[in-house]
């Protein structure tokens, strides 16, 4: 994935502004500041999202965008069956759970947008 990301950045002409790593995110440390943190299609597969949200909060990125799949859409049950049958747990959320997770993880400034299948969260430091 890192090779693909590097190739895409090179093709887009932004390779000098990008750095990609594969690592244990919860244990990782980098002295460089971040402009943004993205977690799109990530919390679908994380049993304990609070640990990651707290770590993302500690990055001090000025803008963060997260997605959380909605519980009880037409897509929920077929997706749950298909993924679990293949040994891949998947997790779904309701709006109050997303807001609770965010606040308990130290996020105070956020907008939760209701999309058709997901909640899209724009979180900010201030």
Regions found by a protein language model. Name each.
Residues 45-59:
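A short, conserved alpha-helix within the catalytic core of class I
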Residues 87-106:
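Short alpha-helix
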Residues 35-48:
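A short SAM/SAH-binding and catalytic strip from SAM-dependent methyltransferases
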Residues 107-118:
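Conserved S-adenosyl-L-methionine
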Residues 1-27:
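Class I SAM-dependent methyltransferase SAM/SAH-binding core
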Residues 60-71:
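Conserved beta-strand signature within the Rossmann-like core of class I S-adenosyl-L-methionine
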Residues 27-32, 47:
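Short conserved loop adjoining the S-adenosyl-L-methionine
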Residues 70-89:
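Short, glycine-/aromatic-enriched active-site segment of Class I SAM-dependent methyltransferases
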């Amino acid at each position: 994935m890192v090779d693909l990301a590097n190739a895409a950045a090179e093709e887009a002409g932004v390779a000098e502004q990008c750095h990609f790593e594969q690592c244990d995110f919860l244990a990782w440390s980098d002295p460089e500041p971040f402009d943004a943190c993205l977690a799109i299609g990530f919390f679908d597969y994380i049993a304990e999202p609070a640990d990651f949200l707290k770590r993302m909060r500690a990055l001090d990125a000025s803008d963060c965008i997260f997605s959380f799949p909605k519980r009880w859409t037409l897509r929920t049950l077929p997706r749950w069956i298909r993924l679990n049958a293949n040994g891949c747990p998947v997790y779904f959320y309701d709006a109050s759970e997303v807001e609770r997770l965010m606040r308990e993880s130290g996020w105070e400034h956020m907008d939760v947008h209701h999309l058709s299948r997901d909640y899209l969260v724009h979180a900010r430091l201030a």
